[in-house]
């Protein structure tokens, strides 16, 4: 009897093998699965081969066969690298916390993330202390809190990771600025406790912030234009009596500095209530007293 057919059952499909007279072997070209084999038993796909002769007798071997089973196990590697994403801080952020909790997520929906390959670098220096890796669907959510406060200024964090099939994601970076110091704010006008009879008053001053320029300024809640050198001025209208002027400078990180001034507007002229000369009349060369009662 002769072999009639040879079939290969793999990944739910059956493939007919063709006899190659030059080698004396049966062969077929089979497409690899679209998913990697990492989630399979032993991280490999199994299969079976069925040989049938002209009489209808058949022999089947599969991955459990003692002789050829290992040869029927196929490892399939994925080609897609993991996805990396920062959740905090965001790119270009200005933050006031010098020890921010840096959070990011690494995912791979095929062979999976190899947690040993997750790397985080702060300003180019690899983090060697432990950081949190929490397993989630398709990957890990990670967080790291610097053990030492970051200096005020710009910082860059980068992350790296690979999947179990060795695909390495391109490093992902995020740059942000730490600002723990509020802006400077000085008022050149008005002086505190000023008393004036003018209803129009110019509020002027200067502000600056080394880390988080530009600084915005409000006078009694109204926005004021700040010049490139940090100077500003705004004319306001006083009400009769006591006026409180509140000037607030805010930097890009949200830090604020507030200066207040008390100004009194008095538009009423003094009123004379009484004027007397004593004695009156007075002798030549003598002295007399003038007495005035006046209110305001």
Name these PLM-found stretches.
Residues 21-34, 136-144, 228-232:
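Aromatic sugar-binding surface patches on proteins
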Residues 12-21, 32, 127-133, 222-228:
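Short, surface-exposed loop motifs enriched in S/T, G, D/E and P with embedded aromatic residues
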Residues 92-98, 192-199, 280-286:
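Short, solvent-exposed loop/linker segments at the N-terminal edge
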Residues 1-10, 108-122, 207-219, 296:
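Solvent-exposed loop/turn segments flanking beta-strands in beta-repeat/beta-sandwich domains
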Residues 32-44, 147-154, 235-242:
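Surface-exposed, short loops/turns at beta-strand junctions within beta-sandwich domains
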Residues 65-85, 173-183, 261-270:
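Flexible, low-complexity linkers/stalks enriched in Thr/Pro that connect modular domains
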């Amino acid at each position: 009897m002769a072999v009639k057919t040879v079939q290969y059952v793999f990944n739910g499909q059956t493939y007919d093998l063709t006899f190659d007279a030059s080698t004396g072997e049966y062969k077929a070209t089979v497409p690899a699965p679209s998913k990697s084999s990492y989630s399979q038993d032993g991280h490999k796909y199994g299969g079976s081969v069925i040989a049938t002769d002209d009489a209808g007798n058949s022999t089947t071997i599969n991955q459990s066969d003692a002789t050829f089973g290992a040869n029927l196990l196929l490892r399939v590697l994925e080609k897609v690298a993991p996805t990396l994403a920062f959740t905090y801080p965001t790119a270009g952020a200005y933050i006031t916390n010098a020890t921010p909790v840096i959070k990011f997520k690494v995912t791979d929906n095929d062979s999976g993330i190899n947690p040993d390959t997750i790397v985080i670098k702060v300003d180019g220096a690899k983090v060697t202390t432990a950081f949190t890796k929490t397993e989630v669907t398709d990957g890990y959510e990670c967080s790291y809190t610097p053990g030492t406060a970051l200096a005020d200024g710009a910082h860059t964090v980068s992350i790296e990771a690979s999947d179990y099939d060795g695909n390495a994601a391109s490093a992902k970076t995020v740059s942000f600025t730490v600002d723990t110091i509020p802006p400077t704010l000085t008022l050149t006008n008005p002086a505190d406790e000023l008393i004036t009879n003018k209803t129009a008053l110019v509020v002027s001053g200067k502000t600056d912030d080394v880390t988080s320029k530009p600084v915005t300024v409000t006078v009694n809640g109204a926005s004021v234009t700040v010049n490139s050198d940090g100077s500003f001025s705004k004319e306001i209208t006083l009400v009769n009596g006591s006026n409180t002027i509140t000037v607030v400078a805010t930097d890009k990180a949200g830090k604020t500095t507030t200066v207040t001034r008390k100004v009194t507007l008095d538009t009423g002229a003094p009123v004379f209530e009484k004027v007397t000369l004593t004695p009156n009349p007075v002798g030549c060369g003598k002295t007399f007293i003038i007495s005035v009662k006046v209110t305001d």
